[in-house]
């Protein structure tokens, strides 16, 4: 009975409505960020885009998407993830329960959904990353608020140091992944010359999509590592954890 109570969804009366609104906004932003690729427009050469009567409006939309949307909403989503962790801990403490096991069970479900999404449907998945980095959050549960802020600041600023190290060493920890992705693509007939049109040839379908997605994990993790997304996301997780503790 105790486990059933602990695992039950948060009642509507317990939810902060503003968090639900922000979650919806974050999801909308992530959708808008990905619609450029989903539509196929991003795969077109500029000479092909020029043929559209809406080309000038498309350029404005592209600028607005890059300026206002791209890379912005994952930070909000990460912040809410950290706040969610603090809410799980608070509920457990109020009931006198240890919520770490519950948190890891939820992360396992998130991991499985994210893995299926990444390997089968869309290389732009973020759920797998959140599950992996979220597994580190319980390590910070006993930190003071000041320590949380120090860790968060250090992680968020760390990409500056990491990029300087890359320049100094002339190497990147992600560099081994790109050749793997290129090799997988080559086996599936995807080359530098045809990658833009591979999915849009006549009679293309699920088989071509699966061939395209086969290298997605390597390309995705190359991007995540090369863009220093991991420390930035974990740092924002911790900011969210701090905000949740303070009930900001």
Regions found by a protein language model. Name each.
Residues 31, 157, 237-240:
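Hydrophobic residues within the alpha-helical transmembrane core of Major Facilitator Superfamily
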Residues 12, 16, 51, 55, ...:
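Membrane-helix interfacial "entry" motifs
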């Amino acid at each position: 009975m105790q486990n059933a109570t602990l695992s039950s969804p948060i009642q509507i009366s317990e939810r902060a409505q503003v968090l639900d609104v922000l979650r919806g906004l974050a999801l909308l932003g992530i959708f808008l960020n990905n619609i450029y690729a989903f539509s196929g427009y991003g795969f077109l050469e500029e000479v092909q885009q020029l043929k559209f009567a809406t080309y000038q409006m498309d350029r404005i939309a592209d600028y607005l998407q890059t300026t206002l949307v791209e890379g912005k909403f994952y930070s909000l989503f990460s912040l809410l993830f950290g706040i969610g962790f603090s809410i799980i801990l608070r509920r457990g403490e109020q009931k006198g329960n240890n919520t770490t096991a519950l948190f890891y069970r939820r992360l396992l479900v998130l991991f499985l959904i994210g893995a299926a999404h990444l390997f089968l449907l869309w290389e732009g998945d973020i759920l797998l990353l959140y599950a992996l980095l979220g597994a580190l959050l319980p390590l910070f549960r006993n930190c003071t608020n000041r320590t949380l802020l120090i860790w968060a600041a250090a992680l968020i600023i760390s990409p500056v140091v990491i990029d300087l190290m890359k320049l100094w060493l002339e190497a990147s920890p992600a560099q081994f992944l790109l050749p793997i992705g290129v090799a997988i693509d080559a086996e599936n007939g995807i080359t530098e010359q045809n990658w833009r049109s591979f999915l849009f040839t006549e009679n293309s379908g699920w088989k071509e999509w699966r061939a395209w997605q086969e290298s997605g994990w390597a390309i995705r993790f190359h991007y995540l590592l090369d863009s220093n997304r991991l420390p930035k996301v974990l740092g924002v997780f911790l900011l969210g954890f701090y905000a949740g503790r303070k009930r900001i």
